[in-house]
Amino acid sequence: MTGATPENRTAPSPPPVKHVPESVLPAKPPKRNNYAFACAILASMTSILLGYDIGVMSGAMIYIKRDLKINDLQIGILAGSLNIYSLIGSCAAGRTSDWIGRRYTIVLAGAIFFAGAILMGLSPNYAFLMFGRFIAGIGVGYALMIAPVYTAEVSPASSRGFLNSFPEVFINAGIMLGYVSNLAFSNLPLKVGWRLMLGIGAVPSVILAIGVLAMPESPRWLVMQGRLGDAKRVLDKTSDSPTEATLRLEDIKHAAGIPADCHDDVVQVSRRNSHGEGVWRELLIRPTPAVRRVMIAAIGIHFFQQASGIDAVVLFSPRIFKTAGLKTDHQQLLATVAVGVVKTSFILVATFLLDRIGRRPLLLTSVGGMVLSLAALGTSLTIIDQSEKKVMWAVVVAIATVMTYVATFSIGAGPITWVYSSEIFPLRLRSQGSSMGVVVNRVTSGVISISFLPMSKAMTTGGAFYLFGGIATVAWVFFYTFLPETQGRMLEDMDELFSGFRWRDSKSKPKGNPEKTVPNPEVEIGSNKQWKEGDTQSS
């Protein structure tokens, strides 16, 4: 047994630069790794749980309000409370996933959400319904944190952006399923329809829990447990080439503080390092400048993703369409299905652009489109609200700009938030750092969801969307200033990237020796560019 006891706060000095012969370089971009693709799909299916709840609640609220005779404040609390409850799961998920592994944490998320969905479907009153949402919220919190972390850790570098956008793809798929469920059960008796809408959400959680058992464990988690042999076998299956698998294993061992010359199948790893003691101190109390910048970037991108109002649009789209002039429940639910179709279609487009265009250009373009859409939506709703007669062109603009808003969100801000925040944290901080980002995401979403109806009454619905547009404008400036491009970077290279980033340098070149040869020609993140022997990177 070979022991390794690294300091928790200070990363080991970089290993000697590897000089890779040209003979090992692939002649063309690697083909998609189908095994890693399947693993990413199974892990990301956890996000269906949140998406379904958001989508189904948007329509179920109409019937819950009538059946249980509750007011708008109670409806807002019902809609937004799941996000607040999810904090428990998100806060616990980092430690849980380091303890039992990423895979069994996903199973746990599915089991908890299953119980919550059954309780909601059987709810006799408002209090019992809130209890069911409390249980489901914990499951959602676990799912939101663990899916992007697992996917980032199992994915080959050439397609990590593509694969790590899958959680957002499945959130959108879940929203779409929720909208369709609303439409399908809307004609049932009042007391039955909304309960079926909520209770049937237990079905995907069962499928998820069974499917996840076929997944391998994260290779990074295996290394943190000292199981190098198991990690190597997983990397051999999920990498684009044997050379990449070897180099990925060396990088992970280096980050975990395991000597490069250690080749045992099982080694002793410091318990403090593998289970997170000291991590919170490094994240919150005494962070290095690089870690501080990573924290600002991760928390900022999660905050602005939700503060720009996406969950208000998705949750309250029937109410928005009613304000825009669609009067019947059927018309409103059909329009929400259209929102789901647009949102899902554009997220699929985004998955193919992430590794071609890069995170930063796509994010800035997306948020710019959101600003324009929110301004037009706020203007059209204000005109409708102030006019005594129906202004048909304003109705058309309002409906169209809801669609353009969710489209521009889905092509950038939606998927990139999860991709970016899951790949920028160093290995030793990844679980806890990612869980903090999810906490901020869910708190912001909960506040927006709970306050949207009171805010709409206080400043009109159009005024609320002007406010969201202003926040999105601030978000664009923040992203331009503080978020470097991570395309073309190894996961273990993020410390160097954030140590040297300056906002004027959009290419985010790292500091270093200009004579330094790129150490890993096959694992450039999200890029098909291949480095030849002797190529250099300078600051």
From Swiss-Prot:
GO terms for molecular function: carbohydrate:proton symporter activity; D-ribose transmembrane transporter activity; D-xylose transmembrane transporter activity; galactose transmembrane transporter activity; glycerol transmembrane transporter activity; mannitol transmembrane transporter activity; monosaccharide transmembrane transporter activity; myo-inositol transmembrane transporter activity. The keyword Cell membrane applies. Induction: By wounding and insect feeding. Highly expressed in roots. Expressed in vascular tissue of leaves, sepals and siliques. This is Polyol transporter 5. The chain crosses the membrane at residues 37-57, 73-93, 104-124, 127-147, 165-185, 196-216, 296-316, 333-353, 364-384, 391-411, 433-453, 463-483. The keyword Iron does not apply. Plasma membrane broad-spectrum sugar-proton symporter. Mediates the uptake of linear polyols such as sorbitol, xylitol, erythritol or glycerol. Can transport the cyclic polyol myo-inositol and different hexoses, pentoses (including ribose), tetroses and sugar alcohols. Its main location: membrane. It comes from Arabidopsis thaliana. It comes from the Eukaryota.
